[in-house]
Amino acid sequence: MPINYTNLLLMLRECKNFRCLLQVHGSLIVSGLKPHNQLINAYSLFQRQDLSRVIFDSVRDPGVVLWNSMIRGYTRAGLHREALGFFGYMSEEKGIDPDKYSFTFALKACAGSMDFKKGLRIHDLIAEMGLESDVYIGTALVEMYCKARDLVSARQVFDKMHVKDVVTWNTMVSGLAQNGCSSAALLLFHDMRSCCVDIDHVSLYNLIPAVSKLEKSDVCRCLHGLVIKKGFIFAFSSGLIDMYCNCADLYAAESVFEEVWRKDESSWGTMMAAYAHNGFFEEVLELFDLMRNYDVRMNKVAAASALQAAAYVGDLVKGIAIHDYAVQQGLIGDVSVATSLMSMYSKCGELEIAEQLFINIEDRDVVSWSAMIASYEQAGQHDEAISLFRDMMRIHIKPNAVTLTSVLQGCAGVAASRLGKSIHCYAIKADIESELETATAVISMYAKCGRFSPALKAFERLPIKDAVAFNALAQGYTQIGDANKAFDVYKNMKLHGVCPDSRTMVGMLQTCAFCSDYARGSCVYGQIIKHGFDSECHVAHALINMFTKCDALAAAIVLFDKCGFEKSTVSWNIMMNGYLLHGQAEEAVATFRQMKVEKFQPNAVTFVNIVRAAAELSALRVGMSVHSSLIQCGFCSQTPVGNSLVDMYAKCGMIESSEKCFIEISNKYIVSWNTMLSAYAAHGLASCAVSLFLSMQENELKPDSVSFLSVLSACRHAGLVEEGKRIFEEMGERHKIEAEVEHYACMVDLLGKAGLFGEAVEMMRRMRVKTSVGVWGALLNSSRMHCNLWLSNAALCQLVKLEPLNPSHYSQDRRLGEVNNVSRIKKVPACSWIEV
């Protein structure tokens, strides 16, 4: 191509990269040609405003065209303040009259910088010059006013325009849709078609969010038809899927997804998000498998949806696979993906991995902090959640409603009402309390801390009292065991004209379960059927749980077998737990086997239940088989699973295996240490128990009453009197833990077996709690062992007073004749069996 002015300008327009632009610029300099305007525009396309400015400054008296090029370049690069500065300098300092293009670019800069005061001044200048009706200026004014949420002014400008092109109509429709005026946007679109404006892809694209918010399937189908007619189906597939999802028409969304023969990453991500939004998590994971098989690039929407699904079903193996694929796709650096990963691992019980992911996030935003606080809260680590919230506040990251909701739940968990009150005050100052979610969390926090006066005040301040607020207040009363007041709240809910939702029914069932109130539970069941909630899974789960807690296992079995709801892993877990509560471990094992036959995927809770069943049956072979499955699934390091394995092996006589499982637990909380202490105590390994007890304190873990009971029990079995006395004194003096009747029974038995009856009786005399059968029984056994007849008779007399209908007390004193005089005594038949 010969080098001339025309060819060089053509080459300048066709530059695809910055290096090519520099070469063409060099050729222009060599040729002595200076197309300043074209060069400024070219450098602006590569966002090199510094070089554009050098060229501009080299011109002695730049005209309005060059000024416009600079203003447009700054606006295009997002440097809106600089663009407005140039506009002001041109018109005010240099005295150059702006033309319609100057005004258009300046108004776009006002919209981009949200400087609407400047925009109003420019509008006044436009009106003075009589340029309001110009199609370019008018469109820019409409866009600016829509960004300012001043739809009245935008519509006035729009209506004054004599000539409107498709861009003008699209801008007005988009402005209405983005500001929540969906119906107005749809009406304007109809006007647009009535005016015979040739709609383009932008017209339809702007309308999709408006139609989505209307949630009308017939309107969705009309828009879908227009998209097909215009031939935009491929480009609009993601938007259509999202639109149908918002209208709860998942079947139509699936049809769009399947009809698109060339699916891009956006289509896959939107479809997965649609499934996740509607609770179809198994389908999300199936799509993920297909996406991976087809080697489709995964975007962050798909990654977040897949991780959410894995977390919900508790499938850690699948979650790890999604993590690996996200790493391959280079998504791991994205904050939203890292936050989703963090949530998935925490919900699957791998809190340590979640913590590490949180630490590795470089630019932690409020969402990341909130997710980690929520993770601690879900794991029951209320103190850690509160501590992290304090760290967040220390580095001046402003919490949102989600953050405050989680940390208020943490305050409720540790009964930290003073801190909860401080957070409540912060929510009021930050104007977050008015958000219903936060207000409900405040009510729940006060109620669960037993502070019903501020809870009721917060409740009364609510402008709109919905079912969620009533539920939160009622659950507070349930937690303190006041079923009557909880049901009074539910009655007031009806008086206020608030319709109960499914969560209300679940709350009422939880109250009945907590108080073992079968009669009320049956009435609630009737209300559930009346309102049509019986087919909802979480309601059915609460029903089964209520029946098992109210000694109505037969009713729970009937409900589970009838299956008026869709069974899930959760429902099988509840049924297994019900059998265990009623001492039917064999049925729990049978339920687990049936669950596997029906192809349900067990989660961590399932494994905890089956390991508990194996422990109760001392069925070592079953326990070892489950342990093998746990290793394959990667659940062994999870705290609840690890605790159950420690207990199972201890009850099956394999204390070495218990120790190994204890070591493998990644996060050892107080329950883990107590389980291992109990195992040592049951096996009479007092020295191991004491050593572990000391190690526990060295790890800065404060022992609780259960810890002391376990180590005292171990000392009792081994006859370690001095060690037991030291630990008992340490419990009250150092750790400020009030001794309970079980602790006294241990000490009386320990002292009595050592023949220290004086100390044993003195301890009983100094007891701050009422003596029980356990304490007198311990004294009776030890006194009989040492042939102390006077003391054994005294202990026996007290036992008979406490439990006159217990035949064992009479038989111990060889008063077998008196047993026949005791009426209505039933003895559970004994049995013996072997594991087959």
From Swiss-Prot:
Residues 775-836 are annotated as: Type E motif. The keyword Repeat applies. It comes from the Eukaryota. Belongs to the PPR family. PCMP-E subfamily. This is Pentatricopeptide repeat-containing protein At2g39620. GO terms for molecular function: RNA binding. PPR repeats lie at residues 1-35, 36-62, 63-98, 99-133, 134-164, 165-199, 200-230, 233-263, 264-298, 299-333, 334-364, 365-399, 400-434, 435-465, 466-500, 501-535, 536-566, 568-602, 603-637, 638-668, 669-703, 704-734, 740-770. GO terms for biological process: RNA modification. The keyword Coiled coil does not apply. Keywords: Repeat.
